[in-house]
Amino acid sequence: MKQLLDFLPLVVFFIFYKMYDIFVASGALIVATLVALAFTWLKYRKVEKMTLVTAAMVLVFGTLTLAFHSDLFIKWKVTVLYVLFALALLVSQWVMKKPLIQRMLGKELTLPDKVWSTLNLSWAIFFLVCGLLNIYVAFWLPQDIWVNFKVFGLTALTLIFTLISGVYIYRHMPEEQKKS
């Protein structure tokens, strides 16, 4: 249910873009994000930090898009968000000495430190690559292609990378965890 709530604003953005334009879609994205955030809080009494960061970015960049009537801001949001995620992963590994991925999943999974580090670094690189891809698609291709890439391309890439990560984790799990 939480994943559906996280995905809902993106669907709203896509629908409003196809029906109207990037500015109406940006406004709808802000509203849908705030509604999803409120619903998540009311239902679970907890909102994940990543969701809060994403909502803050939507609010800031969406508002700038509307205030300056420029799609540059909403296009940059994706890259800035992905770079922030990558930086959080890298700082957790190199400065705080415990990968963020391990902090998030370590209670459920027992994996060697090297596996946690590799997984954490892989996700950081993934986010940086997606951020760079977004810059290319957003600023060198037509807006329609960027919207489709943002909604479907990045979602598909994230799903594929999640599956690859799952296979990698499974290969390194202790046998007793694989059985349960």
Swiss-Prot record:
Where does the protein end up? Cell inner membrane
Signal peptide span per the entry?
none
The protein's superkingdom reads Bacteria
| Gene Ontology, cellular component aspect | plasma membrane
Q: Does the keyword Protein transport apply?
A: no
For this UniProt record, give its keywords in alphabetical order, as a comma-separated list: Cell inner membrane, Cell membrane, Membrane, Transmembrane, Transmembrane helix
Q: How does it sit in the membrane?
A: Multi-pass membrane protein
Q: Which chain regions cross the lipid bilayer?
A: 22-42, 50-70, 72-92, 121-141, 149-169
Q: Which PANTHER family match?
A: INNER MEMBRANE-SPANNING PROTEIN YCIB, INTRACELLULAR SEPTATION PROTEIN A-RELATED
Family membership noted in the UniProt record = Belongs to the YciB family.
Q: Which NCBIfam families match?
A: ispZ, PRK00259.1-2, PRK00259.1-3, PRK00259.1-4
Function of this protein? Plays a role in cell envelope biogenesis, maintenance of cell envelope integrity and membrane homeostasis.
**Would you tell me the protein name for this molecule?**
Inner membrane-spanning protein YciB
Native species of this protein? Yersinia pestis
